Amino acid sequence: MACKVLVVDLDGTLTLGRNTYELSAEALLALRRARDAGIRVVLATANGLDFALTVARYLGIRDVIAENGCLVHLDGVTYELCSGDMAEVDRLVLSTGVVKPSHQNKCRKYDLAYIPLREDAVERLRDVLGPGYVVESSGYAIHVRPAGVDKGTAVKWLCQRLGVPCFQVASVGDSDVDVGMLSVSWGFAVGNATPAAKKAAKVVVDGPSGIGFKEAVEIILSGGACAP
């Protein structure tokens, strides 16, 4: 089996669908199968680190990529992959009136989350903030963070840290915020993923969300992924 590391998104990938937070039983069983096979599983999420670590504990996962790649928790140590003070950015974002803040923001450091109040909220924030910041939607929230960091940069950092080639890392995701990690690894997009996620992935499975994740794990365990 060529796959050494499996990086998996949370919302929309381990859940029953892209519009629910309820975890998929099929996905949980597939996670266990991957761990039992000796694959190192990493949770990669847009959520804040504290929340991500709590969820990861119940999933039997130790390592976490949080805030869309801004923070990595590896072997009990947290690493910051970007820098800067987001307080002024937050004030500017809220002054537009096109979003409201997520309750998680008080626990977030670099990637701030917002609930859209208008359909054009992403475009409006991109115009206001300019090229120094990334503004994108996960399907659950709008995220704003410094440019130059995403789940893909975090996966590449992880590969260097662990001494594992990126082609021996599989990833599974469903949304635009997963494009980076799907591009730099052996990426799987679930069947109901966004067009951008499907385009970035090497493999698009048939099943949606948690069922699709199960299908991806089956392919990985059968040796059908992570070839150079």
From Swiss-Prot:
Its EC number is 3.1.3.18. Mg(2+) binds at D9, D11, D174, D178. Gene3D superfamilies: 3.90.1070.10, HAD superfamily/HAD-like. The active site is at D9 (nucleophile). Keywords: Carbohydrate metabolism, Hydrolase, Magnesium, Metal-binding. Its cofactor is Mg(2+). Substrate binds at K151. Disulfide bonds: none annotated. The keyword Nucleotide-binding does not apply. It catalyses: 2-phosphoglycolate + H2O = glycolate + phosphate. GO terms for molecular function: magnesium ion binding; phosphatase activity; phosphoglycolate phosphatase activity. Catalyzes the dephosphorylation of 2-phosphoglycolate. Belongs to the archaeal SPP-like hydrolase family. This is Phosphoglycolate phosphatase. It comes from Pyrobaculum aerophilum (strain ATCC 51768 / DSM 7523 / JCM 9630 / CIP 104966 / NBRC 100827 / IM2). The lineage of its organism: Archaea, Thermoproteota, Thermoprotei, Thermoproteales, Thermoproteaceae.
